[in-house]
């Protein structure tokens, strides 16, 4: 287990629980366009369906995100990973890890899961190529099985795709 996985098993703080219940209710009434929450009784782990935007490389494609909320959410960012198969994208590794600054260094407690989802959809929609990251094989080789992407020291060097 990773430290991030272990922290999600500790349970949520009262602040995190209240915030997630509020976000859950918002998702029930007005989910972000292109996303659907799969019903679960686990407030800490959500499965989100991502639907590709018409007119983009990912049109008519559906992917699944696994979102794990840490015990101190929203003070800490959730862990967001594409489940297999992950989309072919220059910022999405074959193991589902996503190189997107709002999931790591640029996270703010004012953000919500819906803002992360919109960033992911924007990233997918603006891509001009379907390909793995250039360092995909190297990353997978050095990424221990089950390791949280939050343990990675990401270098955000390209925001063009």
Swiss-Prot record:
Domain UBC core residues, every copy: 15-161
Q: What induces it?
A: By biotic stresses.
Under which name does UniProt file this protein?
A: Probable ubiquitin-conjugating enzyme E2 17
* Source lineage: Eukaryota, Viridiplantae, Streptophyta, Embryophyta, Tracheophyta
Alphabetical list of InterPro entries matching this protein: Ub_conjugating_enzyme, UBQ-conjugat_E2_core, UBQ-conjugating_AS, UBQ-conjugating_enzyme/RWD
Q: Which organism is it from?
A: Arabidopsis thaliana
Similarity field? Belongs to the ubiquitin-conjugating enzyme family.
GO BP: any one term: response to gibberellin
EC no. given is 2.3.2.23
Named in its record, the pathway it takes part in is: Protein modification; protein ubiquitination
């Amino acid at each position: 287990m990773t430290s991030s996985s272990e922290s999600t098993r500790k349970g949520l703080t009262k602040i995190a629980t209240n915030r997630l219940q509020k976000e859950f209710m918002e998702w029930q009434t007005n989910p972000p366009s292109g996303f659907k929450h799969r019903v679960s009784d686990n407030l800490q782990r959500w499965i989100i369906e991502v639907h590709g935007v018409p007119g983009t490389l990912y049109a008519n494609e559906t992917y699944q995100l696994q979102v794990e909320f840490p015990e101190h959410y929203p003070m800490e960012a959730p862990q967001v990973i594409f489940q297999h198969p992950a989309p072919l994208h220059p910022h999405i590794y074959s193991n589902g890890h996503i190189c997107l600054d709002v999931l790591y260094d640029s996270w703010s407690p004012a953000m919500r899961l819906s803002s992360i989802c919109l960033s992911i959809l924007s990233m997918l929609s603006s891509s001009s190529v379907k390909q793995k990251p250039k360092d995909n094989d190297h990353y997978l080789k050095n990424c221990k099985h089950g390791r949280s992407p939050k343990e990675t020291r990401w270098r955000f060097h390209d925001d063009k795709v």
